[in-house]
Structures are given as C-alpha cells and as structure tokens.
Amino acid sequence: MTHDHNHDHEHEERELITLVDEQGNETLFEILLTIDGKEEFGKNYVLLIPANAEEDENGEVEIQAYSFTENEDGTEGDLQPIPEDSDAEWDMIEEVFNSFMEE
C-alpha cells in the first residue's frame, strides 16, 4: 500500500510511534490513520509511514499496516502483522484508507 503525498492535508501535530524489530533496531513512524475494526474483526488497525520518509519517483511513500487490540486497562496493545491471506481485513482497510484519501 502506498500513500501519494502530492496533495494538501495539514500535519498539525504528528502522532509518532517507535517500532522495534527482531534485531532491536528502532524506527520512528508517523501514525497516518487508525481504524476501529473491533465490531467486525475484534481488533483495531493502524496505518504507519516512516517519520522521515522520502517520496519515491512517483511521489509515493510506503505504508505499513498493523492490527492491535486494546489491553484491559484501555491502553493499546502490541502491534501485530495482518495476515496476507485475510482478504476481508485488507478489503476493509483499503476501503477506509481510500475514503480517508478522498477527504
């Protein structure tokens, strides 16, 4: 999934998150969009772009999507990759993302 940055939208206050990979490397990401999917899938989703992302030759930036469930205390839980074969989840994410981009 990519995000075209050749449009106007205000980045008033960026929400940032640090992800740590299996090797312990930290990468800073900007939260592009959160999606409430609890009713349909029992979890929420977040779309991230690297905080210092450079646009490619087409003016696009790579987007990463993850799911998460809230902990019992109301805090956000760990991010989980979305299974590639979960077509219903990916279709919902794409639909919400496309609506977001039209705004």
Swiss-Prot record:
Pfam families: DUF1292
Disulfide bonds: none
InterPro entries associated with the record: UPF0473 (IPR009711)
Family recorded in the similarity comment: Belongs to the UPF0473 family.
Entry-linked HAMAP family: UPF0473
Protein name, entry field: UPF0473 protein SSA_2239
Organism classification: Bacteria, Bacillati, Bacillota, Bacilli, Lactobacillales
